[in-house]
Regions:
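Sec-dependent signal peptide hydrophobic core
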Residues: 9-15, 360
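Ser/Thr-rich, Pro/Gly/Ala-heavy low-complexity intrinsically disordered linkers and tails
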Residues: 1, 15-17, 22-57, 222, ...
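Short glycine-rich loop/turn motifs that provide flexible caps or phosphate-binding loops at active sites
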Residues: 23, 125, 329
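Sequence context surrounding c-type heme c attachment/ligation sites in exported
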Residues: 45-51, 120, 138-373
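N-terminal secretory signal peptides that target proteins for export/translocation
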Residues: 1-7
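Conserved small-residue
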Residues: 47-117, 123-174
Length: 373
């Protein structure tokens, strides 16, 4: 997809990493109801056991107050990563108003990710994930998720955002969020905002999954780049991690987004930006019939939810003046799926973004225009 590639050395190995990796959820006001709405240059490092993190105790009721206590960096001042922390970039990242992102994961000692259901991974207790945001190059926030032991029926993940000090000396947890953080247009989410999106997947993590870790060029020839002619995002860690024993049920091949050209781009975009809510068994299942998440068993565009559910789907709410269907082939201006992406009042997604994604809205518009009546 979109995004320049740069080479970054991580734990002694060169990985192709995206220089700009959008991933977030949108800020339109909720009126009626929002419910309807680079391949690696060298083998990535194996995720070894995480070292003990001193002050961190899985029995504490709350998480660390400072980012420096979360275990991301062995030396915070120099930003030296803790041994075992691995960078990754999703192949199909979520739009976040053009913010630049870095993502990291750390697995606990000797643990494996349960991949018996390849569409719904379960992470071991002790897993940690971080995502750092820069806006116009300015370090603004880092989000942290930490899976801890919890009673049955309760959320085992600590989820919080940390606002960076202006001098970059540390970042402080902000449970209630921070609007227009550090003088930017970027809003740091509250813990409630974190739950809004992350409760909708089986085990909280959205961007670390089968499709997101597959090589973004899986199934493409060298001549089969996306419509923009630029390399896709992603570090393509899936098969390397599988070979190194990080999964209970290792896949034997990358998972290929069906289709070619614009069709492939749109399906990938829906998966990364819409599918974690609009899917079977999601929190919107009873409110909306949209199914925009890819399944690892999808082999052709025609069997995907993006083709079988939104076309001529009667939506729960009519969008003014008379837009009532999910997708009307050939007519993006009559299609809620497109119009809500560009709306100022009923924007999809409803959290985490204030700016229309020109790439995403453009390819969705082109896709609808090309659909046969």
């Amino acid at each position: 997809m979109r995004g320049r590639m740069r080479t970054t050395t991580v734990l002694g190995l060169a990985l192709g990493l995206s220089a700009a990796a959008p991933f977030g959820c949108g800020a339109g006001s909720a009126v009626d109801a929002p419910a309807d709405a680079a391949t690696a240059e060298a083998a990535p490092p194996k995720i070894p056991p995480a070292p003990p993190n001193g002050t961190e105790d899985a029995s504490v009721a709350s998480g660390p107050e400072r980012l420096s206590a979360t275990g991301l960096y062995a030396d915070f001042a120099s930003r030296t990563l803790t041994a075992g922390v691995v960078r990754f970039t999703p192949a199909h990242p979520l739009w976040a108003d053009g913010a630049q992102k870095e993502r990291f994961i750390l697995l606990p000692p000797g643990a494996k990710i349960d991949t018996s259901d390849m569409n719904a991974w379960v992470f071991p207790v002790g897993t940690k994930l971080w995502k750092t945001f820069r806006v116009d190059g300015k370090l603004v926030e880092t989000r942290f998720m930490w899976k801890r032991a919890a009673p049955p029926g309760s959320d085992s993940w600590w989820k919080a955002a940390y606002l960076w000090e202006a001098d970059g000396s540390d970042a402080i947890v902000k449970p209630d969020g921070v609007p227009s953080a550090l003088g930017t247009t970027h809003d740091v989410p509250s813990q409630t905002d974190c739950v809004y999106c992350h409760e909708n997947v089986r085990d909280a993590a959205i961007g670390f999954s089968a499709f997101e870790l597959s090589s973004p060029r899986a199934g493409l020839t060298d001549a089969g780049a996306d419509d923009a002619g630029t390399p896709p995002e992603g570090t393509g860690l899936l098969l390397s991690l599988a070979a190194q024993g990080n999964f209970t049920t290792p896949p034997s091949a990358d998972f290929v987004v069906p289709g070619t050209g614009n069709v492939r781009d749109v399906l990938a975009y829906f998966h990364g930006n819409c599918g974690f809510c609009h899917k079977k068994d999601g929190k919107l299942e009873q409110q909306s019939a949209l199914r925009l998440r890819l399944l690892t068993t999808d082999t052709t565009p025609e069997v995907t939810g993006a083709y079988t559910t939104p076309i001529h789907l009667k939506m729960r709410h009519v969008m003014a003046p008379d837009i009532s269907e999910g997708v009307v082939p050939g007519q993006p201006e009559k299609s809620q799926l497109y119009m809500r992406m560009i709306s100022d009042t009923v924007r999809m997604p409803p959290k985490g973004t204030k700016v229309v994604d020109p790439y995403g809205s453009g390819i969705v518009r082109d896709w609808i225009l090309a659909l046969p009546p």
